[in-house]
Amino acid sequence: MDVRCINWFESHGENRFLYLKSRCRNGETVFIRFPHYFYYVVTDEIYQSLSPPPFNARPLGKMRTIDIDETISYNLDIKDRKCSVADMWLIEEPKKRSIQNATMDEFLNISWFYISNGISPDGCYSLDEQYLTKINNGCYHCDDPRNCFAKKIPRFDIPRSYLFLDIECHFDKKFPSVFINPISHTSYCYIDLSGKRLLFTLINEEMLTEQEIQEAVDRGCLRIQSLMEMDYERELVLCSEIVLLRIAKQLLELTFDYVVTFNGHNFDLRYITNRLELLTGEKIIFRSPDKKEAVYLCIYERNQSSHKGVGGMANTTFHVNNNNGTIFFDLYSFIQKSEKLDSYKLDSISKNAFSCMGKVLNRGVREMTFIGDDTTDAKGKAAAFAKVLTTGNYVTVDEDIICKVIRKDIWENGFKVVLLCPTLPNDTYKLSFGKDDVDLAQMYKDYNLNIALDMARYCIHDACLCQYLWEYYGVETKTDAGASTYVLPQSMVFEYRASTVIKGPLLKLLLETKTILVRSETKQKFPYEGGKVFAPKQKMFSNNVLIFDYNSLYPNVCIFGNLSPETLVGVVVSTNRLEEEINNQLLLQKYPPPRYITVHCEPRLPNLISEIAIFDRSIEGTIPRLLRTFLAERARYKKMLKQATSSTEKAIYDSMQYTYKIVANSVYGLMGFRNSALYSYASAKSCTSIGRRMILYLESVLNGAELSNGMLRFANPLSNPFYMDDRDINPIVKTSLPIDYRFRFRSVYGDTDSVFTEIDSQDVDKSIEIAKELERLINNRVLFNNFKIEFEAVYKNLIMQSKKKYTTMKYSASSNSKSVPERINKGTSETRRDVSKFHKNMIKTYKTRLSEMLSEGRMNSNQVCIDILRSLETDLRSEFDSRSSPLELFMLSRMHHSNYKSADNPNMYLVTEYNKNNPETIELGERYYFAYICPANVPWTKKLVNIKTYETIIDRSFKLGSDQRIFYEVYFKRLTSEIVNLLDNKVLCISFFERMFGSKPTFYEA
């Protein structure tokens, strides 16, 4: 029997079992049940003394136990690390057992199961059926997984089944209550193992009149009275709410591979199950494959108060307790963890994921026709957009113009769509799927058959969006890759944090190397310095800036220095200069490079003046070995990414290589995380110290480098910053560039693993050509061992606001001067939620104007400053006098929480007062909108005081009175504060700011 593993799960009844859900080549699903064990590792001496004897025991052979406590010394008399070798046993017990001196107890039982039996969680196997006992059709028991799964076979493809769903609930306030608000619609996208896709929506007929029901039937809707009458081939079905809920129960109890929702764990599934129990007394029941255990669908919450989010709110995750092998997957929580977005609402996520450039085909009266294909955008973008368009009802044009779809024509690689849209002047526009221009509260207020049918279209679109997002993010691929890498069940891959997922590969490595790492002392945590961030040399750059990144800097630092708790020889500290000098002189004699590396770190305690960590590089440590595995996997996916042809493949492979990059980089974080199995304070501290020296080394050879006559003269000798080696340190290097090229280089900024190098040229093509040659020369001549850099991009018209804040036009390494550059806003107001649309629009306008001035090169920095400030004053005065912009441009949002130091915090007072006077109260954890409003007769106010008192909550019913105005000065001051930080002339900026607002501006730290 050939099977592919697709999920593992446990039953938690009186008799605990582990189950495998697998699929054969013919598409048949097979469940295999295994005994559940708790695992303990003990020495042979302890094993022999156990009474009663262990239930099962396996020899692990001779293993080396290493004490990884850090040795701190004031001289070079460092004691050798404690180390012993003994025969070890792995004990399996069906119930928890207290065993003295057991080791390796920090690892998960499920990881022990996989590794001890040689099973890959996502592997393909030819099962030896003599080790299988049939329980029922499609379910077997196995007591000997090692022999049963002994024959691993090449991976083969299998079909999967899915249920994507969404619901709509009636509400008269802001949020439905399960006790009073019925479900009006449930929509499903059902994909079975044959690949057949069914789309259907159930409409609650109890919210319609009998006349409307008859009209719906006349229009082609199916009306049913019971579950037995359901026809899943019909797109629209009318039924009572009880029938609607019983159909949901029937579908959810099926054993799909995946049931996928968007925030469904917290809302949709919870609402369905609670409403079902309320109206019928029935519950959704899951049964284990052996039919021995039944559990009710229940949503349980996991509150991680140690990981608090924005506003002090605890990070709460929601989980479905099922035992039938189905993976209930919540896209909302997955995307929150994997993407950094301004908003995690479904419309914002789909807008980010599904967009393409469309060409204007025709302009009509209040309508426009767009076409999209492989000629209007990158290959695959239009095809992905067209797929979503099949159920889409609204399209967002140019970021914020929401247009209703009138007609659409879709083919394999493109589309044509007619939109209800104001006439727009350009020939091409960005089209995306954002927010539908509908008000659900108003729709329920005016509810009738036509509205019910409209809502059915919105509901099925949201259900299908779950499928489109599932495919866009490559969740299935990531799940299988994660299961294999982390040695975890597919259902648990995204449940744990980095400190837990790392345990599987770590355990695997320790068993391969026959190593046990133990501590006898309490882990101590001290602060340490992070990565090096350079101060920007200036604000605006008319010349091009080349961006070079170290490839996986921290992982490669760990590999280079062999940083690991067991390779740490010791830490030498000094309390006075004489002691430090003596230690420094003797260190290199006793611990000579390259076998040893000595890392100078900042002292951990105030009474120390120096601290040096010493690592032995002769035998590769646990952490470097682990990192090599992750980096090899990342390299494999990067190679697949380069060979990929479609945008979908590229997205999946790019996300996979990025996942391995994140996992590899997380190892550094785990070295400094006290609760991690990899905790090693000296290693984490040494990692950042070496990283800082590497970025300073690269900056030192590039800052002042010159290119002429085909030769590149680096600014400093190419000396290894850690120890002398046999490399050629001559800074003059021959290039393959034309001999007439003459350019100078200047380092202008750097951050942790990247260096920004200005070249005295504005030619994009030449800059890219030179940067690629620089990349080759740096990797071949400047860097050493496993360190490599990569030329990432040319930044044109770079505007540096401060450290980690900049705006630029980015030309990637694979582009040329004819390519459309990407606008990058790093850490700036355009990417923040707590900034008004007015601010974002204005700052975008002024940055664009600055970029154009830099490109033209006709003005010096003083002239640019004068021109920008003069224009800004005109714009602000004009807006203040006309007061023409709508209120929505000035709205801000904030999360309501109670984690304030002061009990009378003005934010809390604002919401409390609002809730007293409004039936729709603002709940804890909810975002609300507010604006600064003042009396209309207040003149331009220079000095702003007590601005919190002008905050007004903006809800759906708010209208700006004739005696009120927007308190523009608050917004203008914030905008001007950001703009003056873009300009180089501080004197002019201060003078302007004082004249407009009566105070000096705050300049960002360099």
UniProtKB/Swiss-Prot annotation:
It catalyses: DNA(n) + a 2'-deoxyribonucleoside 5'-triphosphate = DNA(n+1) + diphosphate. PROSITE patterns: DNA_POLYMERASE_B (PS00116). Changing residue 611 to K: In ts42 mutant; temperature-sensitivity. SMART domains: POLBc (SM00486). Induction: Expressed in the early phase of the viral replicative cycle. The keyword Hydrolase applies. Its EC number is 2.7.7.7, 3.1.11.-. One of its GO terms (biological process) is DNA recombination. The keyword Glycosyltransferase does not apply. It comes from the Viruses. Keywords: DNA recombination, DNA replication, DNA-binding, DNA-directed DNA polymerase, Early protein, Hydrolase, Multifunctional enzyme, Nucleotidyltransferase, Transferase, Viral DNA replication. One of its GO terms (molecular function) is nucleotide binding. Belongs to the DNA polymerase type-B family. Catalyzes DNA synthesis. Acquires processivity by associating with a heterodimeric processivity factor comprised of the viral OPG148/A20 and OPG116/D4 proteins, thereby forming the DNA polymerase holoenzyme. Displays 3'- to 5' exonuclease activity. Might participate in viral DNA recombination. Does not perform OPG116/D4synthesis across an abasic site. Ts42 is a temperature-sensitive mutant. PAArVg is a mutant resistant to the drug phosphonoacetic acid (PAA). NG26 is a double mutant with a temperature-sensitive lesion and a mutation rendering the virus resistant to PAA. Interacts with OPG148/A20. Component of the Uracil-DNA glycosylase(UDG)-OPG148/A20-polymerase complex; OPG148/A20 and OPG116/UDG form a heterodimeric processivity factor that associates with OPG071/E9 to form the processive polymerase holoenzyme. This is DNA polymerase. It comes from Vaccinia virus (strain Western Reserve) (VACV). The gene is OPG071.
